[in-house]
């Protein structure tokens, strides 16, 4: 039985001093109409809340945790380095070490600039692309999230007479800021071709999640990424891959290595910080040399490349080269996903479960396939909400939004997966009778 007395009290206090009671909206669990989990500590695959409830965690810090929570090696390196100083506002050797390591693992990154968040990474990457190409228009995909910079916080305008234009998904964003942001459905190559036909000399870049992780887990159709690469080559536009979620999650070389399609600029975050705040963008030297102080594209930050995030990330990335690590992660995910599919089928609950590597999402739908934001938006919200809340009562913590992926870490053991499968089976039986 889940207890909530301390959680309820603290959440009331949080809402008095923090907008909505949280410092990032998804943490509020508003989508599932539930009070949030207020974490107290974590270890391995587990989260413990302030009421001492224990959860098997599949949020995994929104994908940032791949080795499990509170990894001893990483935390020991953080503690050891912090005795030298927390931040210097100067270049440190550890920045050079992690930059070299990332470049070694991801060959398309010949130079890299460290920042503090994914938003800073994508914002800076697009500024760089616009400067390098001397073009202004950018293409993003409906439902793909690339941070909260004004010109990226947009989805499609549904007006059939205003194709490819964008609507802000936040108040406070003037419409004219989005005049150069063009939106297409994910996996719809024909729409991209039409945009290039309309603006053949004006597209600075395409920014894409190689695997969409912010409308659940949605995979690219066969040759979709290849076609984007070829189109950018043809029109002298840059291809930016937002690998903030997929970088070091899908493979040691990211999704680009898995699909063998390489971008001009890559955005990274989450895993490369080893659990601490970080972001980065990198690419070919001929492009990256345009970044200040080498070039005219300005980017700066007091905490960019701060040594504590750098040592944390470096320690994490060193561990990821362990032989068979990704194979183990993938096998765990395949086992869990196959059993969840089987259980849903046995209970006559129509679902699509998308997965790749250690990412997965459960969609309650009668569709055969989920391949874009429109498909995700058509899914059965009521079933998702009921599933989330009922399985949470059993100590399983999935992502609290239909539009966020779930993740598995190296520390999820067979017993954790089996408990998750057994709990899901119980909840599918409830869904069968209730919805």
From Swiss-Prot:
- Could you name the Gene Ontology cellular component terms for this entry? cytoplasm
Provide the disulphide bond pattern: none
SUPFAM superfamilies with a match to the protein in the record: PLP-dependent transferases
The EC number(s) given in the record are: 5.4.3.8
Localization terms from the record: Cytoplasm
InterPro entries per the record? 4pyrrol_synth_GluAld_NH2Trfase, Aminotrans_3, Aminotrans_3_PPA_site, PyrdxlP-dep_Trfase, PyrdxlP-dep_Trfase_major, PyrdxlP-dep_Trfase_small
Catalytic activity entry: (S)-4-amino-5-oxopentanoate = 5-aminolevulinate
Q: What class of enzyme is it?
A: isomerase
Q: Which cofactor does it need?
A: pyridoxal 5'-phosphate
Gene3D superfamilies named in the record: Aspartate Aminotransferase, domain 1, Type I PLP-dependent aspartate aminotransferase-like (Major domain)
CDD domains assigned: OAT_like (cd00610)
Q: What NCBIfam families does the record tag this protein with?
A: hemL, PRK00062.1
Family of this protein:
Belongs to the class-III pyridoxal-phosphate-dependent aminotransferase family. HemL subfamily.
Q: How does it assemble?
A: Homodimer.
Q: Spell out the protein name for this chain.
A: Glutamate-1-semialdehyde 2,1-aminomutase
**Corresponding gene?**
hemL
């Amino acid at each position: 039985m889940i207890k909530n007395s301390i959680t309820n009290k603290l959440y009331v206090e949080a809402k008095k001093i923090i907008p909505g009671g949280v410092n990032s909206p998804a943490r509020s669990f508003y989508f599932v109409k539930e009070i949030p989990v207020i974490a107290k500590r974590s270890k391995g695959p587990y989260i413990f809340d302030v009421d001492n409830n224990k959860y098997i965690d599949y949020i995994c810090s929104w994908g940032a945790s791949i080795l499990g929570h509170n990894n001893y090696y990483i935390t020991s390196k953080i503690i050891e380095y912090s005795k030298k100083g927390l931040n210097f506002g100067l270049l440190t050797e550890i920045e050079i070490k992690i930059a070299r390591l990332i470049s070694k693992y991801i060959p398309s990154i010949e130079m890299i600039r460290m920042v503090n968040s994914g938003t800073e990474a994508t914002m800076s990457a697009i500024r760089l692309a616009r400067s390098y190409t001397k073009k202004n228009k950018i293409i993003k995909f409906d439902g793909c999230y690339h941070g909260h910079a004004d010109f990226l916080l947009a989805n499609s305008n549904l007006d059939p007479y205003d194709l490819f234009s964008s609507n802000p998904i936040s108040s406070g964003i003037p419409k004219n800021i989005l005049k150069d942001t063009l939106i297409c459905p994910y996996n719809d190559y024909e729409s991209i071709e039409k945009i290039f036909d309309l603006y053949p000399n004006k597209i600075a870049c395409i920014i894409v999640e190689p695997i969409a992780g912010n409308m659940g887990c949605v995979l690219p159709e066969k040759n979709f990424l290849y076609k984007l690469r070829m189109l950018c080559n043809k029109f002298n536009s840059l291809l930016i891959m937002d690998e903030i979620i997929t970088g070091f999650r899908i493979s040691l070389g990211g999704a680009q290595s898995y699909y063998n399609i390489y971008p001009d600029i890559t955005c990274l975050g989450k895993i490369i910080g080893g659990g601490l705040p970080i972001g980065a963008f990198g690419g070919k030297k001929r492009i990256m040399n345009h970044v200040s102080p080498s070039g005219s594209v300005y980017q700066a930050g007091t905490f960019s490349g701060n040594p504590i995030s750098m040592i944390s990330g470096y320690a994490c990335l060193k561990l990821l080269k362990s032989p068979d690590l990704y194979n183990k992660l993938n096998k765990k995910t395949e086992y869990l996903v196959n059993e969840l599919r089987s259980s849903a089928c046995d209970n006559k609950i129509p679902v699509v479960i998308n997965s790749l590597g250690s990412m997965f999402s459960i969609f309650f739908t009668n569709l055969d396939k989920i391949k874009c934001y429109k498909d995700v938006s058509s899914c059965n919200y009521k079933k998702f909400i009921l599933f989330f809340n009922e399985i949470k009562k059993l100590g399983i913590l999935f992502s609290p939004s239909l539009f966020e992926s779930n993740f598995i870490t190296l520390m999820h053991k067979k017993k954790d997966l089996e408990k998750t499968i057994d709990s899901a089976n119980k909840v599918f039986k409830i869904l069968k009778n209730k919805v």
